[in-house]
Regions:
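PLD/PLD-like phosphodiesterase catalytic module centered on the HKD motif
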Residues: 1-170
Length: 170
Protein backbone atom coordinates (compact mmCIF):
# COMPACT_ATOMS: atom_id res chain seq x y z
CA UNK A 1 0.00 0.00 0.00
CA UNK A 2 1.19 3.48 -0.74
CA UNK A 3 -2.18 5.21 -0.65
CA UNK A 4 -5.57 3.79 0.26
CA UNK A 5 -8.83 5.68 0.34
CA UNK A 6 -11.85 4.63 2.36
CA UNK A 7 -15.28 6.23 2.04
CA UNK A 8 -17.46 5.15 4.93
CA UNK A 9 -20.75 5.20 3.06
CA UNK A 10 -22.01 1.90 4.52
CA UNK A 11 -21.45 -0.58 7.35
CA UNK A 12 -18.88 -2.58 5.38
CA UNK A 13 -16.64 0.39 4.69
CA UNK A 14 -17.02 1.60 8.28
CA UNK A 15 -15.66 -1.79 9.37
CA UNK A 16 -12.78 -1.39 6.90
CA UNK A 17 -11.96 1.93 8.58
CA UNK A 18 -12.21 0.36 12.04
CA UNK A 19 -9.90 -2.47 10.93
CA UNK A 20 -7.38 -0.02 9.46
CA UNK A 21 -7.33 2.12 12.62
CA UNK A 22 -7.01 -0.98 14.78
CA UNK A 23 -4.04 -2.16 12.69
CA UNK A 24 -2.34 1.24 12.93
CA UNK A 25 -2.73 1.39 16.71
CA UNK A 26 -1.59 -2.23 17.18
CA UNK A 27 1.48 -1.38 15.09
CA UNK A 28 2.09 1.66 17.30
CA UNK A 29 1.93 -0.45 20.45
CA UNK A 30 4.47 -2.88 18.99
CA UNK A 31 6.85 -0.15 17.81
CA UNK A 32 5.91 3.32 19.13
CA UNK A 33 6.49 6.42 17.03
CA UNK A 34 8.24 9.43 18.46
CA UNK A 35 5.69 10.91 18.81
CA UNK A 36 2.32 9.62 17.68
CA UNK A 37 0.45 12.68 16.43
CA UNK A 38 -3.35 12.85 16.71
CA UNK A 39 -4.90 15.98 15.21
CA UNK A 40 -8.67 16.11 15.59
CA UNK A 41 -11.02 18.98 16.46
CA UNK A 42 -13.21 16.55 18.44
CA UNK A 43 -11.85 13.60 20.44
CA UNK A 44 -13.67 10.97 22.49
CA UNK A 45 -12.68 7.81 24.32
CA UNK A 46 -13.82 5.62 21.43
CA UNK A 47 -13.41 1.87 21.04
CA UNK A 48 -10.28 1.28 18.94
CA UNK A 49 -9.03 -2.30 19.42
CA UNK A 50 -11.47 -5.21 19.44
CA UNK A 51 -10.05 -7.74 21.88
CA UNK A 52 -13.39 -9.28 22.87
CA UNK A 53 -12.24 -12.70 21.69
CA UNK A 54 -8.75 -12.29 23.15
CA UNK A 55 -7.10 -12.33 19.74
CA UNK A 56 -4.41 -9.86 20.82
CA UNK A 57 -3.62 -11.58 24.13
CA UNK A 58 -0.54 -13.24 22.64
CA UNK A 59 0.91 -9.83 21.80
CA UNK A 60 -0.46 -7.96 24.80
CA UNK A 61 -1.18 -10.25 27.78
CA UNK A 62 -2.28 -7.23 29.82
CA UNK A 63 -5.20 -6.49 27.48
CA UNK A 64 -8.57 -7.29 29.00
CA UNK A 65 -10.88 -9.42 26.86
CA UNK A 66 -13.08 -6.54 25.67
CA UNK A 67 -12.87 -3.43 23.49
CA UNK A 68 -9.78 -1.35 24.24
CA UNK A 69 -10.56 2.36 24.20
CA UNK A 70 -8.44 5.20 22.85
CA UNK A 71 -7.49 6.45 26.33
CA UNK A 72 -6.20 2.97 27.22
CA UNK A 73 -4.30 2.71 23.94
CA UNK A 74 -2.50 5.96 24.77
CA UNK A 75 -1.62 4.66 28.26
CA UNK A 76 -0.36 1.34 26.88
CA UNK A 77 1.69 3.32 24.35
CA UNK A 78 3.23 5.46 27.10
CA UNK A 79 4.02 2.36 29.16
CA UNK A 80 5.97 1.04 26.17
CA UNK A 81 8.08 4.19 25.97
CA UNK A 82 6.07 6.00 23.31
CA UNK A 83 4.94 9.59 23.30
CA UNK A 84 1.71 11.24 22.19
CA UNK A 85 0.96 14.69 20.84
CA UNK A 86 -2.71 15.62 20.55
CA UNK A 87 -4.17 18.75 19.00
CA UNK A 88 -7.87 19.45 19.44
CA UNK A 89 -10.25 22.32 19.98
CA UNK A 90 -10.65 23.75 23.50
CA UNK A 91 -14.23 22.47 23.71
CA UNK A 92 -15.99 21.13 26.77
CA UNK A 93 -16.56 17.90 24.82
CA UNK A 94 -12.78 17.37 24.64
CA UNK A 95 -11.96 18.65 28.12
CA UNK A 96 -12.68 15.45 30.04
CA UNK A 97 -10.48 13.36 27.73
CA UNK A 98 -7.62 15.91 27.83
CA UNK A 99 -7.71 16.34 31.61
CA UNK A 100 -7.98 12.60 32.28
CA UNK A 101 -5.06 11.77 29.96
CA UNK A 102 -2.80 14.49 31.37
CA UNK A 103 -3.61 13.52 34.97
CA UNK A 104 -3.04 9.81 34.39
CA UNK A 105 0.21 10.51 32.52
CA UNK A 106 1.43 12.68 35.40
CA UNK A 107 0.42 10.09 38.03
CA UNK A 108 2.39 7.42 36.13
CA UNK A 109 5.44 9.61 35.50
CA UNK A 110 4.82 9.99 31.77
CA UNK A 111 3.93 13.68 31.70
CA UNK A 112 7.01 14.61 29.66
CA UNK A 113 5.81 12.28 26.89
CA UNK A 114 2.30 13.68 26.51
CA UNK A 115 1.58 16.98 24.84
CA UNK A 116 -1.91 18.35 24.35
CA UNK A 117 -2.40 21.53 22.35
CA UNK A 118 -5.68 23.31 21.74
CA UNK A 119 -6.64 25.66 18.94
CA UNK A 120 -10.04 27.29 18.59
CA UNK A 121 -10.00 27.22 14.78
CA UNK A 122 -8.56 23.72 14.32
CA UNK A 123 -10.25 21.93 11.44
CA UNK A 124 -7.53 19.55 10.20
CA UNK A 125 -7.83 15.86 11.00
CA UNK A 126 -4.88 13.50 10.93
CA UNK A 127 -3.06 10.67 12.65
CA UNK A 128 0.66 10.49 11.99
CA UNK A 129 2.93 7.62 12.97
CA UNK A 130 6.50 6.98 11.89
CA UNK A 131 5.12 4.80 9.08
CA UNK A 132 1.68 6.03 8.03
CA UNK A 133 -0.37 9.21 7.72
CA UNK A 134 -4.15 9.02 8.03
CA UNK A 135 -6.04 12.10 6.89
CA UNK A 136 -9.54 13.04 5.89
CA UNK A 137 -12.80 14.30 7.29
CA UNK A 138 -13.09 12.01 10.34
CA UNK A 139 -12.94 13.19 13.94
CA UNK A 140 -11.93 10.61 16.56
CA UNK A 141 -15.46 10.31 17.92
CA UNK A 142 -18.16 7.66 17.81
CA UNK A 143 -19.95 9.56 15.03
CA UNK A 144 -16.72 9.96 13.07
CA UNK A 145 -15.92 6.26 13.28
CA UNK A 146 -19.35 4.63 13.20
CA UNK A 147 -22.10 6.96 11.97
CA UNK A 148 -21.13 9.74 9.57
CA UNK A 149 -20.01 9.30 6.00
CA UNK A 150 -16.31 10.13 5.99
CA UNK A 151 -13.54 10.19 3.40
CA UNK A 152 -10.23 8.85 4.79
CA UNK A 153 -6.83 8.46 3.14
CA UNK A 154 -4.08 6.22 4.50
CA UNK A 155 -0.63 6.89 3.07
CA UNK A 156 2.57 5.06 3.96
CA UNK A 157 4.82 6.84 1.48
CA UNK A 158 8.02 7.78 3.38
CA UNK A 159 8.06 11.16 1.60
CA UNK A 160 4.49 11.98 2.67
CA UNK A 161 5.10 10.85 6.27
CA UNK A 162 8.30 12.94 6.46
CA UNK A 163 6.64 16.04 4.99
CA UNK A 164 3.66 15.86 7.35
CA UNK A 165 5.99 15.33 10.32
CA UNK A 166 7.91 18.50 9.43
CA UNK A 167 4.63 20.41 9.11
CA UNK A 168 3.34 19.13 12.46
CA UNK A 169 6.61 20.00 14.21
CA UNK A 170 6.27 23.60 13.07
Amino acid sequence: MSTRRINTANATTREELADALQAVFISELLEPSEPLWVITPWISDVEIIDNRTGRFTGLFPEFPQRWIRLFEVFLFLLERGGSVTIACRPLEHNRQFRVKLLKEAKDRGFESRVRVETAEDLHEKGILTSKVYISGSMNLTYNGLRVLEEQITLDNSPAVVATVKINYQE
